[in-house]
Amino acid sequence: MAIKKFKPTSNGRRNMSVSDFAEITTDTPEKSLLSPIRKRGGRNNQGKLTVRHQGGGHKRQYRIIDFKRDKDGIPGRVATIEYDPNRSANIALVHYADGEKRYIIAPKGIKVGQEIESGENADIKLGNALPLGSIPVGTVIHNIELKPGRGGQIARSAGAEAQILGREEKYTLVRLSSGEVRLILTTCRATIGQVGNIEHELVRVGKAGRSRWKGIRPTVRGSVMNPNDHPHGGGEGRAPIGRKSPMSPWGKPTLGYKTRQRNKPSDKYIVRKRKK
């Protein structure tokens, strides 16, 4: 999928770029796999703001995605490749031989009409899902489970990939795109290939209004707030923050401060930490 650039006919268009959606084969989603999404504007069930910079945006419907890939032994055929407003990756509608339809994350290079399957005995082929123990060392994978049967949790966004490096007893060594090397149970499933729509990171929004269409509200600097709103606020004119290090709105150190819980139970599965 290529990136389309615009002529500078206005200030908003000057640096704007969009995906050309060349891979998309239909603009009509499968009705039976849609679910309503109620906008919350970053508020919790008490109406309190818990996530900043959220609100507004175009109305969406959630596409129910098959992250578990547990339909073993039943072949499926890719019917369409579709845009999903809820994620950076595209999705593929799969028609299975028993009549069921499911959405999956669309891997790079998948085509309409291609056959896919899941299970321990599936071929090592793009789009097929197998347990990590059945996938050869060196294979590029995505949509990786952390617990058997829970569904894929890692490497699901546009262009994401991981690679199998080796095996240790009942675990498989997997290198993630962050550079982290992690031990994952060999009974956990993953899908062959890299997630598609890899040019997504090259898209330039171009104007503030396009962020608002996505439901992203403005981010205000702490230094222009009042002191009761932010630790950086207050002072006369363009005052410095007046602290040893930058702070979050709640007074915690930020910008480089480590927030990962110490002695986290999953630390024992991390063989090599991610690149800084």
Curated annotation (Swiss-Prot):
One of its GO terms (molecular function) is structural constituent of ribosome. The keyword rRNA-binding applies. InterPro entries: NA-bd_OB-fold, Rib_uL2_dom2, Ribosomal_uL2, Ribosomal_uL2_bac/org-type, Ribosomal_uL2_C, Ribosomal_uL2_CS, Ribosomal_uL2_dom3, Ribosomal_uL2_RNA-bd_dom. It comes from the Bacteria. It holds the Pfam family Ribosomal_L2. Residues 219-276 are annotated as: Disordered. GO terms for cellular component: large ribosomal subunit. PROSITE patterns: RIBOSOMAL_L2. SMART domains: Ribosomal_L2 (SM01383), Ribosomal_L2_C (SM01382). Keywords: Ribonucleoprotein, Ribosomal protein, RNA-binding, rRNA-binding. One of its GO terms (biological process) is cytoplasmic translation. One of the primary rRNA binding proteins. Required for association of the 30S and 50S subunits to form the 70S ribosome, for tRNA binding and peptide bond formation. It has been suggested to have peptidyltransferase activity; this is somewhat controversial. Makes several contacts with the 16S rRNA in the 70S ribosome. Part of the 50S ribosomal subunit. Forms a bridge to the 30S subunit in the 70S ribosome. Belongs to the universal ribosomal protein uL2 family. PANTHER family: LARGE RIBOSOMAL SUBUNIT PROTEIN UL2M, RIBOSOMAL PROTEIN L2. This is Large ribosomal subunit protein uL2.
